[in-house]
Every structure is written in structure tokens, then in C-alpha cells.
Amino acid sequence: MNNYWEKRTRANAQKAEKEAATYARRLNSTLHHAADEIDRYIADLLLDISSGGTPTRTQLWTAGKYLKLRDCIQQQCADVGQRQKDLLDELLPKLFDEILETNLADFKTADSFLPTRMIRQSLDTAWSGQNYSTRIWTNTNALAAKLEQDITDYIILGKSRA
């Protein structure tokens, strides 16, 4: 009997890892797309500026196109944050349905599964003093600030992200 539960636990852990890996791949694809979009915009900006001679740091900093670049970065960060939120919204209920609810079936009758209202309530419960949505936006804003600072540093110092 004990062997059955060990196999069951391992199978459920493998399901969770598979779902998490799928989520990670999809998020990684979104991040690469955003980075490529930003790189393309930076290349276009530098090409426009360099066609008039070698730009100085001051010229680059004060160029009106810098504002467009910053807007592009902010838009890409917002898009990445929204995509991450959408992927998590899709992943968490799926993991619950396939793993936790399956395990609960062994201990409860079929008509006593957690209702959708309780699942939603568990997602809305505060963790570390913040609810799910607030944590997503906190992480998104931190990512946006870091990305904006990195891009600015790359432009000023002439480095590439690779």
C-alpha cells in the first residue's frame, strides 16, 4: 500500500514539473520576443543616429528618439508582465485540477471537490502581505525598472546584451 502512494506522489510531482516546464518555456519565449523587439528598435535608433556621424553620449541621451526608445521598453515590459500574468492564471488552476484535486479524490467522495469559488478564494488570499494580482504587478514593475536601467546602461556604455 505504501508503494502505491509513493508512485502516486512521484507521478503527481512529474505532472507538476511538466506543467511548470511548459510554463517556463512559454514565458521564456515571451521574454525573448520582447528582447528581440527592443534590440530591433535600438538597432534602428542607432542606425538613424549614426547616419549623421558618430553620436556622442550627450547627443544620444538628449535625442528625441530616446523618448521613443523608452516608451518602447516600457510597452514591452508591460506586455511581458501581462503575458506572465495570463500564463500563471492558466497554469495554477490547471495544476490544481490535475494534481491537488486528483489527490483529494482519494480522501473525499466525488461530489465534495472544492468548488470554483474556493479555488478563486485561495488565489485571492494574501501571501507575504500581498494578493496574487499585487504580487504580479510588483514583480512586473521591478522587471520593468531593471530592464529599463539595463537598456540605458547598454546604450550609454555601448555594450550588447549578449
Where are these regions (language model features)?
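N-terminal leader/targeting and assembly helices and adjacent pre-domain segments
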Residues: M1-R161
